[in-house]
């Protein structure tokens, strides 16, 4: 999965955001295992996945707060 853009994230429904976070967490888990066993080639993907999760959660919180 490539780096997610904020416009794409804002267009997602809350359920889609939850699914995307779950998928990224699974990917991050697998990437950590690959790094531990020395099989990880694209080390920057770990950082991208972590930041994508944070980006999705931040936008979701902003949208939740805006509704109040």
Swiss-Prot record:
The keyword Ribonucleoprotein applies. It holds the Pfam family Ribosomal_L29. GO terms for molecular function: structural constituent of ribosome. PROSITE patterns: RIBOSOMAL_L29. This is Large ribosomal subunit protein uL29. The keyword Signal does not apply. GO terms for cellular component: cytosolic large ribosomal subunit. CDD domains: Ribosomal_L29_HIP. It comes from Rhodopseudomonas palustris (strain BisB18). Belongs to the universal ribosomal protein uL29 family. Keywords: Ribonucleoprotein, Ribosomal protein.
